[in-house]
Structure formats: C-alpha cells, structure tokens
C-alpha cells in the first residue's frame, strides 16, 4: 500500500513538472485532481503515521519541484535540430495520467510554433474526438528569425497498452514576446469537405452590372423652372392692367363729354316765329293772361282789345264775324 502511494506521488510530481510551464492555475488544478485521486484510492485502507509523514514530505517536495521547474534555465531552441527534446517515462499510462484523458495537441501561448501528427489508431480507447482532420506536411519548415528564444521545453511520451504512442510538447513563454515570422506549412493534399456544407457556394465573385436605359423626357414638365411662374404672373398682370386702364379711360372721356354738352344746354329754348301776327289764334292763346270764354255765342279766342268798352258794338260784331264779301264767285267748268 505504501509503495502504491509512493508511485502515485512520484507520478504526480512528474506530471507537475510537465504542467509547470502552463501557469499557476493549471498547476493548482492538476495537483488538486491528483491528490483527490490519491485520497480516493486510500479511503478504504488504513495508513500509518509514517505514511502520512511521507505524504506531507512528498507534498513539500512537489511545491519545491514546481518552484524549480518555474525557474529552470531556458533552452536554446534554434540550436536543436527540431526544437524538441524527448523525455520518456517508464511509468504506465494508468499510473501517470490517472483518469485524465490525453489530448493530441496542446498549445499554450500565441507565439508557440507546433506541428503534431497523432499516431493513435481510431479504435484505441484513448483516441480523442477533437483530433485535427488535416495534418501538416512532413516537409513543413518553420521560418524563424535569428533571434535566440528563451523558452523552456518539456516533452513526454506516453505509451498505451495498444502500442500507440502520444507525444506531448509544452513550451513555456517568457513575459517578453520576441518577433517571430509565421510558420510556412505546405498542405499534403486538397481538403476533403462535405458537399452539403458547400451547397450554394460559388468560388468566384459574381458581378452584376446594371445597364441604364436611356429615356428622354421633357425636363420642363418634370422639373419646371422657378422663373416661369413669375413671368406668367407678370404677363397676366400686364394684360389685366391694360384692360382695366382702357375701361377707365373710356368712362372718363364719356363723363367729360357729357359735362361739356350739359353746359351748352343750360340756356332755355323756345320756338319763335320770324314774324308776329296777332290775329293768329296761336299767338292769342300763348299771350292770354286770363281764361277765355268758351261759350257757343262767342266762340272766338280771347282778345283783350275786343272786350274794350270804348269800342262800339258794331265794330265788335264786325270783328267777331267772318267776312263773307271777299269770297270770289265760283267758276263753272265749260
């Protein structure tokens, strides 16, 4: 039982060395998981005080080893042929990894340059479903600058019962980020894609050119000039003013002519004969100041001289009668 506990502690120590470059958070998670596994295996069996002391000492060794791993001297990556050193451990996968599931590729920081080909068969129990479907070309050469990179590298090769090996590469990055040229990878073949994912996809860019149709329209109707309504208003105003002025002028001239003609007609107009004959009955009628006698006996027009008392009656009767002596005799026809 004590030997099993030592083996587990050694495996946790080795695993902590591997995961020391990932950061403080990954170290705490891994150590707590491994310690939890140790406690699960040792739940049902009593452990002596010596084994507990050994566990405490092993925990102290784990913390010191983590500090040493974090302060380990950096490796010069360009001096190596492939930039990766392999460390093999003889411990089995059951004791070294526990219930953890191995991954095919572990990448930590953005400046990490890593290419990995998984050799695990598909029907192996530890085959991961997250394996990359495309593998890099074996002749892929990373183009690196001549700068010396201060990165620490830890590799581990785990052997499984199915004779399949998994290589895990871990690079710890320094706080300073050196300039690195991008990796040049030559693909070994065309990408295999499903036909369903590219339905309706066209490899070329379609360009649609619109050909405008020329349509000539009268711009005066669509966009009338703003000065045209003003001109039309001016023309209509001029015509209306001319008509109104003509009417007023004619009426004014008519009024002036009427006034001039009225002044000329102010004098009284009377019909006068060129000679005055008092024996005419019309003149007697016009000059009669009093009403005349209309009796049958005296049917002549009124004459004031006839009513004079100084005149004899014979003369009055003679004037009143019609003289018949001057009538010539009628001539008989032969």
Swiss-Prot record:
Pfam families named in the record: Mucin15
Stored InterPro entries: Mucin-15
Q: Which residues lie on this side of the membrane: Extracellular?
A: 24-236
Tissue expr: Expressed in spleen, thymus, prostate, testis, ovary, small intestine, colon, peripheral blood leukocyte, bone marrow, lymph node and lung.
Q: Where are the transmembrane segments?
A: 237-257
Q: Which GO terms describe its cellular component?
A: extracellular region; Golgi lumen; plasma membrane
Q: Which residues are glycosylated?
A: 30, 61, 79, 90, 148, 155, 163, 218, 225
Secreted listed as a keyword: yes
Instruction: Describe the PTM.
Output: Highly glycosylated (N- and O-linked carbohydrates).
Which residue stretches belong to region Disordered?
64-104, 304-334
| Alphabetized UniProt keyword annotations | Cell membrane, Glycoprotein, Membrane, Secreted, Signal, Transmembrane, Transmembrane helix
Residues on the membrane's Cytoplasmic side span: 258-334
Q: Where is the signal peptide?
A: 1-23
Q: Where is the composition biased (Polar residues)?
A: 77-94
**Summary of the function given for this chain in its UniProt record:** May play a role in the cell adhesion to the extracellular matrix.
PANTHER family according to UniProt: MUCIN-15 (PTHR45427:SF1)
What is the protein name given in its UniProt record? Answer: Mucin-15
Native source species:
Homo sapiens (Human)
């Amino acid at each position: 039982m004590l030997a099993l506990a030592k083996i587990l502690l050694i495996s946790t120590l080795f695993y902590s060395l591997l995961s020391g470059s990932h950061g403080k958070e990954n170290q705490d998670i891994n150590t707590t998981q491994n310690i939890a596994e140790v406690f699960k295996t040792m739940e049902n069996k009593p452990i002596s005080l010596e084994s507990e002391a050994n566990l405490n000492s092993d925990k102290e060794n784990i913390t010191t080893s983590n500090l040493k791993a974090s302060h380990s001297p950096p490796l010069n990556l360009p001096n190596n042929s492939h930039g990766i050193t392999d460390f093999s451990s003889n411990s089995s996968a059951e004791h070294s990894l526990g219930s953890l599931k191995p991954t095919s590729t572990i990448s930590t920081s953005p400046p990490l340059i890593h290419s990995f080909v998984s050799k695990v068969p598909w029907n192996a129990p530890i085959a991961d479903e997250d394996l990359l479907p495309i593998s890099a070309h074996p002749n892929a050469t990373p183009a690196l600058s001549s700068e010396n990179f201060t990165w620490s590298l830890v590799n581990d090769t785990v052997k499984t019962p199915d004779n399949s090996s998994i290589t895990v590469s871990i690079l710890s990055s320094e706080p300073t980020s050196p300039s690195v040229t991008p990796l040049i990878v030559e693909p070994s073949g065309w990408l295999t894609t499903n036909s369903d994912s590219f339905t309706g996809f066209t490899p070329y860019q379609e360009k649609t050119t619109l050909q405008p149709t020329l349509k000539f329209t009268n711009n005066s109707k669509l966009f009338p000039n703003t000065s045209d309504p003003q001109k039309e208003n001016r023309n209509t105003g001029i015509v209306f003013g001319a008509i109104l002025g003509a009417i007023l002028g004619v009426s004014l001239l008519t009024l002036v002519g009427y006034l001039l003609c009225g002044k000329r007609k102010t004098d009284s107009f009377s019909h006068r004969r060129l000679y005055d004959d008092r024996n005419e009955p019309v003149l007697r009628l016009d000059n009669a100041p009093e009403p005349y006698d209309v009796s049958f006996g005296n049917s002549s027009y009124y004459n004031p001289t006839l009513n004079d008392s100084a005149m004899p009656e014979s003369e009055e009767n003679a004037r009143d009668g019609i003289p018949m002596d001057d009538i010539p005799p009628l001539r008989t026809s032969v």
